[in-house]
Amino acid sequence: MEADVIFVNRALCDFYHNKEIPNEDIRKLYFDLEVSMLGGVPDIETGDQPIISIACYDSFLKKYIVFAIAKEQKITNGKTHSYFFYKTEREMLSKFLQFVQDTDPDMFLGYNLDGFDAPYIINRLKWLKMDATKLSRCCEMPRTEKEDFGFRNKIFGRVLLDEMKMYKKLALNKRESYSLEYVSQYELGEGKEKYEGTLDELYEKDFDRFIRYNIRDVELIVLLDEKLRMVDYFDSIRRMAKCKFEDVFMNSRVIDSLILCFCKDKYVLPSKKRNAEETFEGAFVVQPPKGLFDMVGWLDVKAMYPSIMMTFNMSYETLLDVPEEGCINIDNKYYFTTKRTSILKTLLQQLIDSRDDDKKRMKQIGESNAEFKSLDMSQWTKKLLCNSIFGVVGFSGFRLYNIKIAEAI
């Protein structure tokens, strides 16, 4: 029972099941690498081509910092920008690592960070036989592993968040492209620094513009996060569900942590089982008649799936194999006891009531109040958690999985 809960998740549950995780100010380092292609297309798995520039933004310093290889430079520092130029890549990377050690960021962010920047800088440092442990907080060697759809990266003591990955998770509709240029134009109405030829040619012929290009990418990454509040959103999920940052992209892990904390000191939950994937019939969709119609109405049921689960007291522990007196009977196929309130019903009701309280408070204080944005983030997070509970009920790897519940819904 609960034998599969890893140490970190167990500690989060034990220490914070009945209290909030503090909303700390996260020190974020947004960064972007520029890599030379004169020697060929860079191999991410080996880091075989030199890094020629690193632009970053520190959220505490509120400043853009550039580390680059340059023989001569005429760019001067300002209040919002600092430039550091070096003769060799080793010297540049050494100073960047020292900057990371000195500023000690909680989080690295980038656009396509998992797919390029994070694995590349880790592997480039290894290629050069430099001390990659200086990227971490605890003198541990960073890890990067090739997966089917990218890389799994870990820098110990620091969170890695890929803005492209966050954006894909948050965007309600699929985009034509998820490139930084397309998303920036779509969300901000502005895009990357334009240039002709190759980036290596720009580096050689117009170094100032090359640096502007590198900085501009980081500016767009910062602006996207400021507008869409992506880090705030996923941090809100993390704190509410009491899970790790790397878990927030998987609804099953988020809800698992949420339910473990909710049941702490009340119930001991079963360990996860390796169930075979099963299919079940979903909702019946009626095909509309063809043609053009007047007076068309559109109905939306508020929190339909969570409401169904609460109305019929659905959960792993209330599902009956055989009917009992007074039980809930669905199509003479699925039976749920009414002798006790289900875990999922109680949890859903608490989330819905708490969300309603947030929305009432928002109306009372108005958008000009400093508390408004925090409440708005809170109520959206609770909405997502409610919908995610339904989503994981039919997932075979869920701790409280039972296909009959998914079918009954």
Give residue ranges: language-model regions.
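Conserved catalytic core of nucleic-acid polymerases
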Residues: 1, 5, 301-304, 314-315, ...
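Extended, Lys/Arg-enriched charged tracts that mediate electrostatic binding to polyanionic substrates
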Residues: 4-12, 20-39, 130-132, 137-147, ...
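Conserved RNase H-like, two-metal-ion catalytic cores of nucleic-acid enzymes
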Residues: 9, 15-107
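Conserved DEDDh/DEDDy metal-dependent 3′-5′ exonuclease domain
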Residues: 73-174
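Acidic, Mg2+-coordinating catalytic module of metal-dependent nucleases/exonucleases
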Residues: 102-117, 158, 163-251
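Short active-site loop/helix that positions an aromatic residue
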Residues: 117-126, 302-316
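Common nucleic-acid-contacting/processivity interface regions adjacent to the catalytic cores
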Residues: 200-312, 371-409
